[in-house]
């Protein structure tokens, strides 16, 4: 399964399963270079049809010398366009051209200093304007032992004699490290040099052009029809509604479904926001009993997500029948949602299902409109600013479509939802008062499926445990736990335990992404 957003693209990134692949696209887009990610097994004819100006081979967990290695059609190197290999991509390039790749005696993970070798001619283009001795991020267990014929070394590190290589005649380059990771000090410049200096890509990707293009596409597609827009009150769906309203005006029918899994005061805040800030008429549907009824007895997180996604569609279908002329359903699907729903191993190996991804059931009569499906989160915020939306709306922390259902471990019920809402209000109140809310990417509480013994007064308790999760991130692709002051964490814990009956223990999640994900389910 391949996700194609545009007929043509400046750069194609072939994904071999690296946890950092999406970061490659993000770094390039920061320079205004449009690119897309496709699975490594994309058909050669499909690649040629896109007419890319260059190809990037991502990193990945496999080894090129193993039987089940992720391989590509060698004809990719015969398309007459530049190719950049990153980590596994470098080993694959070495392997294909007759070099030797072997298991390293010592794995190399973390920071390393890269020294440029004597550079001449085209071999220097990758590092043009950059400085030798800068820190990069290594993450590999294999190494290149012998270069293929025609290749030369252009950089090395203490543990990697071949930290970067280049073909002496053809525009083929490869690096053993990850330039896309923020720890690589000038890594983004290497990617920029490849895209602009070597491939000759254009850097005209920006939100003004994107907005104008999408408005035109929406108008041409919708014409005299009507669009039902799924609204959650989060940044994504709010930007979708604002974009659609700009494009088609009264032909937009925005529907906010209260599925009973919202945070405290969420419904009222959403209704106020649409009325006062967006000036878009909003229809609210209370479907909490329907959702909670279908979730009864369900504890598996994947099943919960699917039930919620299917029920959303059913509710919207009922609402659509109340209005004549509705042909389309609009959703706030983002590019990471699309990518994460397609594994590099093919459609049978889905990494993670997403409630917005996968199309509509056969019984539905309207078509999907997903104007944000090629954007990352920070690009959505930039688009919102381009549309004139207020900052306080755009900078709200992300909130998942399935809501609190995936922040309650196990079965979801009304009592646990109330417990979690109360704890969440306290945590967010303390975070905002301390000034850390705007400094963090996402903050929430999780009700664990764990009870523990406690003592309150002279009485023994056996109550619930709540986990506080606060992370820092640039785009949500990677994240680190926020190093909050102990005094702040103590205030959160004390207030939650004292003010919320049924909770006697609070813990703080100090996991980063990867290896953990931001949400628990």
UniProtKB/Swiss-Prot annotation:
Q: Does the keyword Nucleotide-binding apply?
A: yes
Which positions form S-S bridges?
none
Q: Does the keyword Isomerase apply?
A: no
Boundaries of each GMPS ATP-PPase domain copy? Answer: 205-396
The UniProt annotation places ATP binding at 232-238
- What EC number(s) does the entry state? 6.3.5.2
A cellular component term (GO) from this record? cytosol
Q: Which reaction does it catalyse?
A: XMP + L-glutamine + ATP + H2O = GMP + L-glutamate + AMP + diphosphate + 2 H(+)
A Pfam family of this chain: GATase
User: In Gene Ontology terms, what is one molecular function of this protein?
Assistant: ATP binding
- Active-site positions on this chain: 87 (nucleophile), 178, 180
Name of the top EC class for this enzyme: ligase
The pathway to which it is assigned is: Purine metabolism; GMP biosynthesis; GMP from XMP (L-Gln route): step 1/1
Domain named Glutamine amidotransferase type-1: which ranges?
A: 10-204
What keywords tag this UniProt record?
ATP-binding, Glutamine amidotransferase, GMP biosynthesis, Ligase, Nucleotide-binding, Purine biosynthesis
Q: Which HAMAP family match?
A: GMP_synthase
Quaternary structure annotation from Swiss-Prot or TrEMBL: Homodimer.
List, alphabetically, the PANTHER family matched.
GMP SYNTHASE [GLUTAMINE-HYDROLYZING], GMP SYNTHASE-RELATED
Instruction: Summarize the protein's role.
Output: Catalyzes the synthesis of GMP from XMP.
Q: What is this protein called?
A: GMP synthase [glutamine-hydrolyzing]
Q: Which organism is it from?
A: Wolinella succinogenes (strain ATCC 29543 / DSM 1740 / CCUG 13145 / JCM 31913 / LMG 7466 / NCTC 11488 / FDC 602W)
């Amino acid at each position: 399964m391949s996700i194609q957003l545009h007929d043509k693209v400046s750069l194609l990134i072939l994904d071999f399963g690296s946890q950092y692949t999406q970061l490659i696209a993000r770094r390039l887009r920061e320079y205004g270079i449009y690119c897309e990610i496709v699975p490594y097994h994309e058909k050669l004819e499909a690649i040629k049809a896109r007419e890319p100006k260059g190809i990037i081979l991502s990193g990945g967990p496999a080894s090129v010398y193993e039987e089940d290695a992720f391989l590509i059609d060698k004809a990719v190197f015969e398309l007459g366009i530049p190719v950049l290999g990153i980590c596994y991509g470098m080993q694959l390039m070495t392997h294909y051209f007759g070099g030797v790749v072997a298991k390293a005696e010592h794995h190399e993970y973390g920071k390393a200093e890269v020294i440029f070798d004597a550079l001449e001619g085209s071999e220097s283009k990758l590092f043009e304007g950059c400085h030798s001795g800068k820190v990069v991020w290594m993450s590999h267990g294999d190494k290149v032992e012998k270069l293929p014929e025609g290749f030369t070394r252009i950089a090395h590190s203490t543990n990697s004699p071949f930290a970067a290589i280049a073909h002496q005649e053809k525009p083929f380059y490869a690096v053993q490290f990850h330039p896309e990771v923020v720890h690589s000090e000038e890594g983004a410049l290497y990617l920029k040099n490849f895209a602009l200096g070597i491939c000759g890509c254009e850097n005209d990707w920006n939100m003004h052009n994107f907005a104008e293009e999408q408005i035109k596409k929406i108008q041409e597609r919708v014409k005299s029809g009507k669009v039902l827009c799924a609204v959650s009150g989060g940044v994504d769906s709010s930007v979708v509604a604002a974009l659609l309203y700009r494009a088609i005006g009264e032909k937009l029918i925005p529907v906010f479904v209260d599925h009973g899994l919202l945070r405290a005061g969420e419904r009222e805040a959403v209704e106020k926001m649409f009325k006062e800030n967006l000036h878009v008429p909003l229809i609210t549907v209370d479907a909490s009993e329907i959702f909670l009824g279908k979730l009864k007895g369900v504890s598996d997180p994947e099943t919960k997500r699917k039930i919620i996604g299917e029920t959303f569609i059913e509710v919207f279908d009922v609402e659509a029948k109340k209005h004549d002329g509705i042909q389309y359903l609009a959703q706030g699907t983002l590019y990471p949602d699309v990518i994460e729903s397609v594994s590099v191993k093919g459609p049978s190996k889905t990494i993670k299902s997403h409630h917005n991804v996968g199309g509509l059931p056969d019984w539905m009569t309207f078509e999907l409109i997903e104007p944000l499906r090629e954007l990352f989160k920070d690009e959505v915020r930039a688009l919102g600013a381009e549309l004139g939306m207020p900052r306080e709306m755009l900078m709200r922390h992300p909130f998942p479509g399935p809501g609190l259902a995936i922040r309650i471990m196990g079965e979801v019920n009304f009592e646990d939802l109330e417990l979690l809402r109360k704890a969440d209000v306290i945590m967010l109140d303390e975070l905002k008062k301390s000034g850390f809310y705007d400094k963090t990417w996402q903050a929430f509480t999780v009700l664990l499926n764990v009870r523990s013994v406690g003592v309150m007064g002279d009485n023994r308790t056996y109550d619930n445990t709540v986990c506080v999760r606060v992370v820092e991130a640039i785009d949500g692709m990677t994240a680190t736990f926020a190093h909050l002051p102990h005094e702040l964490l103590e205030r959160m814990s004390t207030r939650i335990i004292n003010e919320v009956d049924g909770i006697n223990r609070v813990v703080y999640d100090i996991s980063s992404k990867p290896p953990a994900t931001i949400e628990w389910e």
